[in-house]
């Protein structure tokens, strides 16, 4: 089942990233400083997109899996699609959330892109449960540095 879902998840993330890179805003100087401290290499590629709700996958199988794992819900405040970051409107300007999502950007870079990141992140979520995976805990630790 995982090997069926992974390509769907990769395509969905690629589509989301394209939209965010097209419509999103570049980081401002304060946000760039946070990104530098988080260790992102490609600072100029990052875009933020303010949304009323973080979108869910349209594919029914992928949507059901994301909801069952607790990865995306109406309560999701942010989501990173490699260099594109969705930020829910009521969290716009929240430094901690931004730092958390930027930590995921750094993880995408470190792990080598969308497929390697999703393979590891989703495997951790399935094995340890969300939000107990190593990558998510790393992002939570980064978030705390910017409280």
Task: Give the label of every model feature segment.
Residues 1-44, 50-56, 61-80, 86-92, ...:
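Metalloprotease/metallohydrolase-associated module, dominated by Zn2+-dependent proteases
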